[in-house]
């Protein structure tokens, strides 16, 4: 992990924040596109198959269930995209709250939506190709532990102590 003084020494905080959010947004847009493609494919397969041959014929029903599953994934991805687009408008934070990007001495978090792990190009002279971030929702226990903290504050979560080094 880079030291606090090294982190963000190349870009200002606002630009870095935008870069991180855009990386997460690109990931979610890809998830949405894939879900839409799969949903359309399942619908097309169901249409091509035609009506059920008899009441025990479950292929069409299976395709419709798949379509519905992908439709739900698409809806969730689109909801996350809307949240991320809204967060692009926020300035960097001084305290950990929804929308903040938090760098601890152990991990990096984006407190936004439950998206999971994503990568961002590393902004340092150190030869590390990408930083790993975790986009987490407000319902997660780690979010609750971080909420309200400031730079220099520590939390203990699952037996691991982490110190907040930077908040964007």
What annotation goes with each model-predicted range?
Residues 160-168:
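Short, Lys/Arg- and Gly-enriched loop/turn segments at beta-strand edges
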